[in-house]
Amino acid sequence: MIIKEPIKDFYGKILGYIETDDVTGNKIAYDFYRKILGRYNKRENCTRDFYGKILSRGDTTQALVYNTQQKAN
């Protein structure tokens, strides 16, 4: 089952979304327009960007959404 969670700023504006697969624990980060920003693979314990480049060890999908919003402003 896929769980979709909106990521909001302090004022309640939706910045993006994170989809989590209940079975595998993998996550996909989307911006407000549903463009894929990156993916977290639980088995590898790493977060990759849209192009597949490793960004960090651990789950930093929420940071991808926030960083994209910061660049837009």
Where in this protein do the model-derived segments appear?
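Intrinsically disordered, low-complexity proline/glycine-rich segments
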Residues: 1-73
